[in-house]
Amino acid sequence: MDSRLSAAYAIRAARISMIPGGVDGLVINYAEGGEPAWVQYPLKKQKPLPNNLCYTPTLEDIARKREAVIAKYTKQPLETGTTFTHVLNASHLNEQYTRVKKSALPDKEFPIIETEKYPEPPILWETTIGAPSRLFDRSDGVKYVR
């Protein structure tokens, strides 16, 4: 084969292999002598776990947590106070404050203006492991309903 012809092909092949484009670049024609270059994909970013200090929640995570909190306080019926029936002095007892097992109102963002029945927000006592007392049905200081 003529060496001049192969030199021309070699130059053309070198030019073809230098065509940029990365992953989705132009397809190299093997018949023309082009050699595909090794493609370097960008490194996959590792997302930190929720227990990591570098973890930042996505909007989806925030929405999921928000839905869980809303469901916790709105889907379950709130407990009401007990009314006394068939008990001696029932009318007097019903006029008094009666105990409610769980805190019937949320402890965060308590609407203090609208609620004349509850003069101050309910106290949620911290237990030994730091969970709010409403999880354990513990009674607390101001959980009374009229």
Curated annotation (Swiss-Prot):
<protein>
    <recommendedName>
        <fullName>Minor capsid protein P5</fullName>
    </recommendedName>
</protein>
<keyword id="KW-0946">Virion</keyword>
<dbReference type="GO" id="GO:0019028">
    <property type="term" value="C:viral capsid"/>
</dbReference>
<keyword id="KW-0426">Late protein</keyword>
<comment type="function">
    <text>One of the minor capsid proteins that constitute a network internal to the major capsid proteins and outside the lipid membrane. The minor capsid proteins glue and stabilize the capsomers.</text>
</comment>
<keyword id="KW-0167">Capsid protein</keyword>
<comment type="subunit">
    <text>Interacts with the major capsid protein.</text>
</comment>
